[in-house]
Curated annotation (Swiss-Prot):
Transmembrane segments: 25-43, 62-80, 100-123, 265-290
Compartments (UniProt record): Membrane; Cell projection, Cilium, Photoreceptor outer segment; Photoreceptor inner segment
Function statement: Essential for retina photoreceptor outer segment disk morphogenesis, may also play a role with ROM1 in the maintenance of outer segment disk structure. Required for the maintenance of retinal outer nuclear layer thickness. Required for the correct development and organization of the photoreceptor inner segment.
Subunit structure, interactors included: Homodimer; disulfide-linked. Forms a homotetramer. Forms a heterotetramer with ROM1. Homotetramer and heterotetramer core complexes go on to form higher order complexes by formation of intermolecular disulfide bonds. Interacts with MREG. Interacts with STX3. Interacts with SNAP25.
Membrane topology value: Multi-pass membrane protein
Coiled coil: none
Entry-linked PANTHER family: PERIPHERIN-2 (PTHR19282:SF202), TETRASPANIN (PTHR19282)
UniProt entry keywords in alphabetical sequence: Cell adhesion, Cell projection, Disulfide bond, Glycoprotein, Membrane, Sensory transduction, Transmembrane, Transmembrane helix, Vision
Protein name: Peripherin-2
One CC-aspect GO term: photoreceptor outer segment
Gene name in the database record: PRPH2
GO biological process: cell adhesion; detection of light stimulus involved in visual perception; photoreceptor cell outer segment organization; protein heterooligomerization; protein homooligomerization; protein localization to plasma membrane; protein maturation; retina development in camera-type eye
Carbohydrate attachment residues: N53, N229
Organism expressing this protein natively: Felis catus
Amino acid sequence: MALLKVKFDQKKRVKLAQGLWLMNWLSVLAGIVIFSLGLFLKIELRKRSDVMNNSESHFVPNSLIGMGVLSCVFNSLAGKICYDALDPSKYAKWKPWLKSYLVVCVLFNIVLFLVALCCFLMRGSLESTLAQGLKNGMKYYRDTDTPGRCFMKKTIDLLQIEFKCCGNNGFRDWFEIQWISNRYLDFSSKEVKDRIKSNVDGRYLVDGVPFSCCNPNSPRPCIQYQLTNNSAHYSYDHQTEELNLWVRGCRAALLSYYGSLMNSMGAVTLLVWLFEVSITIGLRYLHTALEGVSNPEDLECESEGWLLEKSVSETWKAFLESLKKLGKSNQVEAEGADAGQAPEAG
């Protein structure tokens, strides 16, 4: 028995075709939106590629771009089919291909749903990518004279200013690396020598941070050196006083930014997916309603449209059986090819 059967007369078929035509062209616009979102995300990821590990994935933006293009193509074609469905002579050329086209639409909807899920799940992979990338970027902060790394200081400073953050997980990350170039160290100074000797790796470590970590909203002039030395500053206690630095780490700031982007894009993609599913269902009803017209010359006759020709369980069984038959036919062809090669070998 057909699933969700609906009766159609000529007036209802025309209204369905016209409604689907309009929905398809709206979906073309939605496809352009998805394409634009994917392009925007790709550009934003490229902007921060210097503070991301080399393994950062552009799968999600590339998928959004691809699905946006496919949405425009498929819905333009579906709009043409719906327009021609009003004319029996024009619809005849689409009739042999419509069932296959519906299968392609179902596959497209499945992939679109998976892409929407990927938008929500990208945060995990992005977190590890940012953690390693920011760590490397901070390590190369001092290499202003090294070709290929001379831009890293400017990149990190602009990042910390724009996102109001400091370090990877926090400002103390700067205490663990030498971020001042040897070029600007006075090696004749006893303080510099003592600091380098006190470190196992021979690095010049200080309890200070770059200027870009300073919070301009603080009423006190920025304290960026000797942050843990209370006696170095008047009326200062680093354990109890709120420092005039950005407290949040840049990894958390970037994750928050990209996370909000991905959630918004995932929500938009899900809405487009729901719209595409409704179009596919409408196309299925239009297809079965037109197929059910008993007398093509009598356009006023009633017909029945349905979503599935059989129940869900029966349709699933038929699908599994078709897969088994396909597998057996491939196996027979392979055995026939092996048998044909055996006499030649003899």
